[in-house]
């Protein structure tokens, strides 16, 4: 899995599963066309739409030093009716 890091399971993403939309975090340097091509090739599905947004990094403190986590990109992938993606591994939060 080059582009997709892990599936996202929030209240909104679980609600979107009923509309055949799947949510996952992807590498921030990946483009929409790369992710679409990769999903269609790996899962054997037809993607009809993709929405993406970049989420900001958060501040992390280690003692007196304040750090920053990396920003990441989240994709919402809409599939054609009749296609589905098996559940991806869930990342524990």
UniProtKB/Swiss-Prot annotation:
Q: How does it assemble?
A: Part of the 50S ribosomal subunit.
Q: Which domain of life is it from?
A: Eukaryota
Q: Name one Pfam family in it.
A: Ribosomal_L23
The entry's family comment says: Belongs to the universal ribosomal protein uL23 family.
What is the stated purpose of this protein?
Binds to 23S rRNA.
- One GO cellular component, as annotated: ribonucleoprotein complex
Question: Key word Zinc present in the record?
Answer: no
- Output one GO MF annotation: mRNA binding
Name the UniProt record assigns to this protein:
Large ribosomal subunit protein uL23cz/uL23cy
PANTHER family hit by this protein: 60S RIBOSOMAL PROTEIN L23A
Compartments where located = Plastid, Chloroplast
Report the InterPro entries cross-referenced here.
Nucleotide-bd_a/b_plait_sf (IPR012677), Ribosomal_uL23-like (IPR013025), Ribosomal_uL23/eL15/eS24_sf (IPR012678), Ribosomal_uL23_CS (IPR001014)
Q: Which UniProt keywords apply?
A: Chloroplast, Plastid, Ribonucleoprotein, Ribosomal protein, RNA-binding, rRNA-binding
- Gene Ontology biological process: translation
């Amino acid at each position: 899995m080059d582009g997709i890091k892990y599936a996202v399971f929030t209240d909104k993403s679980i609600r979107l599963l009923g509309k055949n939309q799947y949510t996952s975090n992807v590498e921030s340097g990946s483009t929409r066309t790369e992710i679409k091509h990769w999903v269609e090739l790996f899962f054997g599905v037809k993607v009809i739409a993709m929405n993406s947004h970049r989420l900001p990094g958060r501040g992390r403190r280690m003692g007196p030093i304040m750090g920053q986590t990396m920003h990441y990109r989240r994709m919402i992938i809409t599939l054609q009716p009749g296609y589905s993606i098996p559940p991806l591994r869930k990342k524990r939060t």
